[in-house]
From Swiss-Prot:
Predicted to be exported by the Tat system. The position of the signal peptide cleavage has been experimentally proven. Its EC number is 3.5.2.6. This is Beta-lactamase. SUPFAM superfamilies: beta-lactamase/transpeptidase-like. The class A beta-lactamase family has a specific amino-acid numbering system, sometimes called Ambler or ABL numbering and often misspelt as Amber. A multiple sequence alignment was used to derive a consensus sequence and then the consensus was numbered taking into account insertions and deletions. This allows use of identical numbers, e.g. for active site residues, despite differences in protein length. UniProt always uses natural numbering of residues, hence there appear to be differences in numbering between this entry and some papers. Keywords: Antibiotic resistance, Hydrolase, Signal.
Length: 294
């Protein structure tokens, strides 16, 4: 059996366990040490580093690992950029119906929506959806231009209580993820604060927060969902870059009203900028932590 096949079997087993756990009430089992041991084993197995924050927003139960380890933010910044656009619209500074010209000369790689609209106009709402649901990089750059550039994402992060996240560059340079480079980085702890604020807190008004959640529920790039039982879904934003950098952050929603804040940041320790992304690991991590949070 190949390594990938073994991983898929393990994810399937963990999802089954999560489905059982999701239906069990009462006190949670003791989990901190066993989960921590399993996370360390996953790091050894795949030669990766894992930053994780997972919390039940109703009970307060949580699991953490390498909370303050620095990771490349990659496309998880798009959640903040879209939230800032919504905030500006709420304050009357812009309108979501404002139209933006998509210049073919400004297209960057991984822009499936804007490539098809090159030479035409898109509304800010459409750009938000493209950035959040397809991780469209040109759409993200147009949102950055609207809100004031990368520094505006850093400022927004600070305004919602995230004291660590910083965005320095534009797509696609921000995904270089060079080990030790502080540019365009965050931590699991910081993103947990920020994503909780924009999706479950008061960073946005209820209507704007609801719109952001709806957009993110329609995400087509989610890695978390592979680790969730039937009946669950997410409002999340992925990110990936060099050195195997692979992230996912957002909220998982259960069929009985459960809400779990999940932030997973990973990278390879192989020192290879072309290292394979770790999307399957994100699903595996989701399935691993879910039963212990319920």
């Amino acid at each position: 059996m190949t390594g990938l096949s073994r991983r898929n079997v393990l994810i399937g087993s963990l999802v089954a366990a999560a489905a059982v756990g999701a239906g069990v009430g009462g006190a949670a089992p003791a989990f901190a040490a066993p989960i921590d041991d399993q996370l360390a084993e996953l790091e050894r197995r795949d030669n990766v580093l894992i930053g994780l924050y997972a919390a039940n927003l109703q009970s307060g139960r949580r699991i953490t690992h390498r909370l303050d380890e620095m990771f490349a933010m990659c496309s998880t910044f798009k959640g903040y950029a879209a939230a800032r656009v919504l905030q500006m619209a709420e304050h009357g500074e812009i309108s979501l119906d404002n139209r933006v010209f998509v210049d073919a000369d400004a297209l960057v790689p991984n822009s499936p929506v804007t490539e098809a609209r090159a030479g035409a106009e898109m509304t800010l709402a459409e750009l938000c959806q493209a950035a959040l649901q397809r991780s469209d990089n040109t759409a993200a750059n147009l949102l950055l231009k609207t809100i004031g550039g990368p520094a505006a994402v850093t400022a927004f992060a600070r305004s919602v209580g995230d004291e660590r996240t910083r965005l320095d560059r534009w797509e696609v340079e921000l995904n270089s993820a060079i080990p030790g480079d502080p540019r365009d980085t965050s931590t699991a702890a910081a993103l947990a604060v920020g994503y909780r604020a924009i999706l479950a807190g008061d960073a946005l008004s209820p209507p704007q927060r609801g719109l952001l959640e709806d957009w993110m529920r329609a995400n087509q790039t989610s890695s978390m969902r592979a680790g969730l039982p039937e009946g669950w879904t997410t409002a999340d934003k992925t990110g990936s870059g060099d050195y195997g950098s692979t992230n996912d952050a957002g909220i998982a929603f259960g069929p009985d009203g459960q809400r779990l804040l999940l932030v997973m940041m990973t990278r390879s320790q192989a020192h290879d900028p072309k290292a394979e992304n770790l999307r399957p690991l994100i699903g595996e991590l989701t399935a691993l932590v879910l039963p212990s949070l319920l």
